[in-house]
């Protein structure tokens, strides 16, 4: 990689095959073009992936056509997922639009990675995305975990049938303006998604209202938040590795819908590791537990410590309690938050 817009500390081997997500917008178009210019043998080693959710009618179709033209011009293979009846699925699954779209998108990416024998996925998250993620997590009340930003390389865990997806984010230190300037310098057009301006979405509120307001006190707030996220993401990764070694003493037992471990061994763990292990366990039982609040984690700690009688519903369809010397967390399948 020789382009200065790529500024990362970790990356897959340059011999690897990669799936590159492209929506047609500025960020992903810039990423794909950078990969074409910098990745060895891109026509053989890169496969572009586009999802057409069909939510914006003719605009969605125009996005797909624009992506097809770019990939044909740059001689990059393209795989497209056309989502049928997205709104019907949304109603049936009772999920938010963003969660449903994310689930469909990453499931598609995972299938492509497996089919193409690829290392994983490259996505176009940039410096502002990092800052917004850190601030969003902090505002949701996730505590110190909220300061942990996006990782350059991360392994996402899904269901048993599609367990993992490696994700590379090579643009985390690159600004949005730099990507726009890069495309303009090469006379490359991109698509604009009008929904990115709608303040009905939480992320857009943070981008267009909260960050600009807070930046009145620190004009470099976006950069500060992004760097904080980068540092804490590395520390978070170290803590996860340390946690795995410590948790081996718990003699934990997993089933598809439950986890249990020795209560006395759990109580010997440092409180910081206890909270982290509860979050890890809850998220493994249900992906929706990513939204588990500090108070809900504390509730599980009280139940597991015998300071509160159980079993009790602790949110997201999970219940916690004690059975003899064992403490447990179960997924009842009821999707409450």
Q: Predicted segment positions?
A:
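Catalytic subdomain that performs nucleotidyl-dependent activation
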Residues: 115, 120-124, 129-228, 232, ...
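AMP-forming adenylation/ATP pyrophosphatase catalytic core
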Residues: 2-27, 43-51, 83, 104-105, ...
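Surface-exposed charge patches
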Residues: 69, 111, 180-181, 212, ...
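ATP-dependent adenylation/nucleotidyltransferase module used to activate substrates
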Residues: 1-137, 158-160, 177, 266, ...
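Histidine kinase transmitter module recognition
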Residues: 38, 70, 213, 217, ...
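A structural signal for well-ordered alpha-helical scaffolds and beta->alpha junctions
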Residues: 60, 64, 106, 175-176, ...
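Short, solvent-exposed polar/charged micro-motifs at secondary-structure junctions
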Residues: 88-93, 202-203, 234, 322-324
